Amino acid sequence: MADKLNEYVALIKTEIKKYSKKIFNSEIGQVISVADGIAKVSGLENALLNELIQFENNIQGIVLNLEQNTVGIALFGDYSSLREGSTAKRTHSVMKTPVGDVMLGRIVNALGEAIDGRGDIKATEYDQIEKIAPGVMKRKSVNQPLETGILTIDALFPIGKGQRELIVGDRQTGKTAIAIDTIINQKDKDVYCVYVAIGQKNSSVAQIVHQLEVNDSMKYTTVVCATASDSDSMVYLSPFTGITIAEYWLKKGKDVLIVFDDLSKHAVAYRTLSLLLKRPPGREAFPGDVFYLHSRLLERACKLNDENGGGSITALPIIETQAGDISAYIPTNVISITDGQLFMVSSLFNAGQRPAIQIGLSVSRVGSAAQTKAIKQQTGSLKLELAQYSELDSFSQFGSDLDENTKKVLEHGKRVMEMIKQPNGKPYSQVHEALFLFAINKAFIKFIPVDEIAKFKQRITEEFNGSHPLFKELSNKKEFTEDLESKTKTAFKMLVKRFISTLTDYDITKFGSIEELN
């Protein structure tokens, strides 16, 4: 009996040793007021900025204001059941979103929850949406081209992997079209894409998703969607969710393209939240930290050095201007943050020029280092020629007495403008772009009437298809060697002769001499 008792005592002692008492300090606050998506809560003295707060009925919010006795919390989703006196509980964690390859082909909201009707996202990894951007020593300079498939951009304003290139312009000038065409052109190029719809109409987002599906681009794309019907807190959060999803692939050494469409609506949503939180307004009623809002977002797009995986995030933020005013507060802020801008203008768009990029005000500050050599060789003076044409074109409208030189510049300019026209959803390969530029640079287009340029471009793509030996050689070498240039000249002379022979009422003496094509 004594043995049995000793055995029980030993067992109890062992169990006592195993026992560890954990005290959980759960801070619970009380809602003082709730209105317009903002809750004022007392009793959460130790709450952290950007901390996730859990309310009754599974309602969540994020801490944006820390005051002496209360905290200001932006609420997500339907908060209609929240009342004065409702409880609020600290989660001791910041906002996180699911990340990983499971996000590809999915449409998610600003919280990373699926909204495409294809079931929940079975993510195994989550990452916090607010992070410090990689430091200078983790980065390297941009040295690889991101092929947009848009001739004007790849030739004149090349974008490199890891660059931030702003697309700025009035509404209905083709800004989104450029971004979507760039996503479509990443097919089979091992580039992951994230499209962030910020404050867009539901119908517009549905149209964009349909366009991506038709072009088989959704398999490497994630769409983060905070539409006009969502709360301002969701709109505010969406770009940070998008860049966090992109950073997962960046860490894996992959290349990512992210589009923010558009940051003007993002700034307006942040202004609304700030005013509701009673923060002091500044210029155009925006809060004082609206610059930091966009700089901390766009600085997370970068090109990492090889020690850190060598991945990249290329960002295409979009800004909408009012009546072409790029000197407004938000446009100038984002221009100063980014590595260049493409300025879209209504006058060119209405005149039928697609893409409607104004050459004079657009620039790419770092992309030229990443430009393909074949394209670089052919674009030497193209920007200058187009700038001269633009100036002379407006000048020539005032008088008809023009000297021969001016007439030549105008005629050449008209043909170049036709050559760089490009319909939506039809990106060009780098080889075809190089060949179009070759035709411009070596003045083969002077033999073609202006209204026949579009057909001539079509003829170039048909003639120099994937099986053509010149196409293969240029695709492999990625530059015009002396021998390749000579072969290409000969091929173009034959092509131009064949093309002009099909034209009716064509007189070569109006354009040049036949000897130039022999």
Curated annotation (Swiss-Prot):
GO terms for molecular function: ADP binding; ATP binding; proton-transporting ATP synthase activity, rotational mechanism. It catalyses: ATP + H2O + 4 H(+)(in) = ADP + phosphate + 5 H(+)(out). Transmembrane segments: none annotated. GO terms for biological process: proton motive force-driven ATP synthesis. Its EC number is 7.1.2.2. Its main location: membrane. The keyword Nucleotidyltransferase does not apply. It is a peripheral membrane protein. One of its GO terms (cellular component) is plasma membrane. F-type ATPases have 2 components, CF(1) - the catalytic core - and CF(0) - the membrane proton channel. CF(1) has five subunits: alpha(3), beta(3), gamma(1), delta(1), epsilon(1). CF(0) has three main subunits: a(1), b(2) and c(9-12). The alpha and beta chains form an alternating ring which encloses part of the gamma chain. CF(1) is attached to CF(0) by a central stalk formed by the gamma and epsilon chains, while a peripheral stalk is formed by the delta and b chains. This is ATP synthase subunit alpha. It comes from Mycoplasma genitalium (strain ATCC 33530 / DSM 19775 / NCTC 10195 / G37) (Mycoplasmoides genitalium).
